[in-house]
């Protein structure tokens, strides 16, 4: 019992103060070893074995010697007792964990099948046999069965070896979910890869079904994969070329707006050389009007033809006009080709082509009154005020439609409201003659005095207002068709017919360069 206080004092020398144990520091005895005042002593019970003889009676020198020796050893307690407690506590925790692992291993059922499936190869086997493996990978061809072939039974022997090679290049602790989240971002996946993915998953589900090998099918599959890769590379190259062409065309339009025609034409030419139809059309405009390059109609026709062959509606319209304007194209096949291109552009919704065909079909040898009304009506509904005015003439004279004077007046009013000067002049003439609400006979007389024939050649003064319309730069000066004897006027006359504007061509290029 007399050793217990010493053990407690040795284990808890710092946490227990003298006030708790009601012990004061031991002072220095004259004949004993000296102790420091900071050393704490635990209470020592009265271990005097003298019994009831009283304090003055001693149990002998041997008994007092053991007590003094123990007190002297207790006063020399080492200050490293906290480190000892931590060390022993750590060892105790490790021992508990070891016992827990031993208990868990002992609870598992024993057997060769369980040991094989619990090996570290099992997660890699499931990974390499899953459809998440890249469909175009060379490893997958040796691991997964082909879509048409059997599921080889030796894949389980080869997969761990391939899995070890792959594990050296990837972190070993990545999860199945992280792989699934990263796979859709693979840029090399295309449509054939998805098709192979479906076949791979179905072959895994039917892995237990035996089948005969088909070497020919595997070769065809490899060939199709090779072709798919080549198609993917070609598509990427075409996309890159298109992006560069769009950038060049955009720079050309920006330079055209800023007035740098030379730089604009240079950018248009670079984009046109890459096969971009919109840049080819813009380059044709520059050649036709001499902006940034000397004026050359033959080169303009060439660029229009290149863009028209790709389905560019504005290029089809301008190329058809050039064919009709060329004296060498007076023979029938070239005219039919020009009319066919104009129809394609008009059917695509191009207002300029619709207006041009509406007037073209009122003149020989293309005279077709019903088709003329059709295209004039389409152009008028697309906002062309001049076509609305021409449609009013057709209703007033019964050209291609049943004669309707009220509809003719409404067409004149709608065209005049859009700023058409010819329609405004026609309305003023009707009002000055007292024809604001005329009878049928009065309006017939007025119409006969004003118009001798609704044909194109008789509309010289009526079509003169076309030169003052905003779309005259694209449709041409239709009022000069009768005086020139053939469709279209010279480029000089067309340029003079365009209303004065700081950059008429630049506005046309910017508006139509991306259309």
Curated annotation (Swiss-Prot):
The record marks 142-143 as: Cleavage. InterPro entries: ISR_Activator, Sel1-like, TPR-like_helical_dom_sf. SUPFAM superfamilies: HCP-like. GO terms for molecular function: protein serine/threonine kinase activator activity. Keywords: Apoptosis, Cytoplasm, DNA damage, Membrane, Mitochondrion, Mitochondrion inner membrane, Mitochondrion outer membrane, Repeat, TPR repeat, Transit peptide, Ubl conjugation. TPR repeats lie at residues 213-244, 245-277, 278-312, 313-350, 351-384, 385-422, 472-504. SMART domains: SEL1. Residues 19-65, 144-226 are annotated as: Disordered. Protein kinase activator that acts as a key activator of the integrated stress response (ISR) following various stresses, such as iron deficiency, mitochondrial stress or mitochondrial DNA breaks. Detects impaired protein import and processing in mitochondria, activating the ISR. May also required for the induction of death receptor-mediated apoptosis through the regulation of caspase activation. PANTHER family: DAP3-BINDING CELL DEATH ENHANCER 1. Belongs to the DELE1 family. This is DAP3-binding cell death enhancer 1. It comes from Homo sapiens (Human). The gene is DELE1.
